[in-house]
Amino acid sequence: SGCSGASGEGGETEPPGESGSAQEESVESSSNEITDLVIPKLSTKEIAGFNILYTQKGEDFEGLTSIWDGLLEVDPEGKLVPAIAEEWGTEDEGLTWTFKIREGVKWVNVNGEEMADCNAQDFATGLEWVLNFHKNDSLNTSMPLEMIEGAEEYYEYTKSLSKEEAYALTAEEGSKFREMVGLETPDDYTLIYRCLDK
């Protein structure tokens, strides 16, 4: 039956009491209607925090994704397009993904002042934080655990540590994170993820 409200079997094709001329007037007036009006959705709730890696609330995530860029984003047609990554691809049918980060992307503070260049190490640091049980107590780790090689093992490893030991961990070259997790940064603007499955 779809959205028409009709059952699809029999029934009237015109609303009761409308003749053909009344319908023609209705069609003419509808051509003058506004068809591309956009009304933004505003949240009436406060954002709990600005750490996009930690948030557990949908309304937080909606707001934060408007002010944070990822490697890729989705265009209005639902296609992946460049954001911080200027190019990306795989050479082994999806087991390994390489992202080339655009040079000149800056981290800015709340006032819009440039603080630092965004580079591949920033993504490694972010992933280490998400996968570190003691640093990220929100437990929002399902996607990286299910997708990235060694992510679940690293998460379980950090669980076995004291809070102090876990907080001392980093994502720097030669770290336990780099040893265990399928992420490489061969240079400042190249990021490689090794996945569990295609």
Where are these regions (language model features)?
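Short, well-ordered beta-strand elements
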Residues: 33-46, 96-100, 123-126, 191-192
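Sec-exported extracytoplasmic/periplasmic mature domains
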Residues: 72, 76, 103-106, 128-136
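Residue-level recognition of beta-strand termini and adjacent short loop/turns
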Residues: 90-93, 185-187
